[in-house]
Swiss-Prot record:
InterPro entries: P-loop_NTPase (IPR027417), Rab_GTPases_membrane_traffic (IPR050209), Small_GTP-bd (IPR005225), Small_GTPase (IPR001806). This is Ras-related protein Rab11A. NCBIfam families: small_GTP. It comes from Nicotiana tabacum. Belongs to the small GTPase superfamily. Rab family.
Length: 216
């Protein structure tokens, strides 16, 4: 989902955080949106939601971030929240091998529900616990090469690469939407009659750019 409201932000992008329960998604979200970290963070029940506004190449982008429950019993509920998402951060815990082994299951689920243009970044969380690492760097590099994903390691505790992960995915989303808007303008211009003005409306399931003085 991408909306434009002139007086608040230029674009609104919906994102989802996915991965097994306990990998640290909620702490990543609280670190990014409130710069907070809780050692006793509890597992998400259903879906949590937060926003943060930041600059992407001179544009004001509001990230609407949905933190989905990792437990299997909530899958039917949270899968509905994939709808309209243009970005996904998929997390595993570098100290728990099973969370890494489940990454491909999460990718299958995401691809079953995703928009075709969704941007996906894989993140190995809890990099502050490298002495307990259960996933080798060779394993994660092999997976990202196989799946064609961007990758980085994060730590909500140390605030390592948290902002970078979101900045990277929001920039990638912005590039995709900008290219689609430009392509639509060029297509419309090529079909316009000589001497006539052209009005361009860009709209699809993943990007809906609006102009006006309204607010949401």
């Amino acid at each position: 989902m991408a909306n434009r409201v002139d007086h608040e932000y230029d674009y609104l992008f919906k994102m989802v955080l996915i991965g097994d329960s306990g990998v640290g998604k909620s702490n990543i979200l609280s670190r990014f949106t409130r710069n907070e970290f809780c050692l006793e963070s509890k597992s998400t029940i259903g879906v949590e939601f937060a926003t943060r506004t930041l600059q992407v190449e001179g544009k004001t982008v509001k990230a609407q971030i949905w933190d989905t429950a990792g437990q299997e019993r909530y899958r039917a509920i949270t899968s509905a929240y994939y709808r309209g998402a243009v970005g996904a951060l998929l997390f595993y815990d570098i100290t728990k091998r099973q969370t890494f082994d489940n990454v491909q299951r999460w990718l299958r689920e995401l691809r079953d529900h995703r928009d075709s243009n969704i941007v996906i970044i894989l993140a190995g969380n809890k990099s502050d616990l490298k002495h307990l690492r259960a996933v080798s760097e060779q394993d994660d590099q092999a997976l990202v090469k196989k799946e064609g994903l961007s990758f980085l390691e994060t730590s909500a505790l140390e605030a390592l690469n948290v902002d970078k992960a979101f900045q990277t995915i929001l920039t990638d989303i912005y590039h995709i939407i900008s290219k689609k808007a430009l392509a639509a303008q060029e297509a419309a211009a090529s079909t316009a009659l000589p001497g006539q003005g052209t009005t361009i409306n860009v709209s699809d399931n993943s990007a809906n750019v609006k102009r006006g003085c309204c607010s949401t």
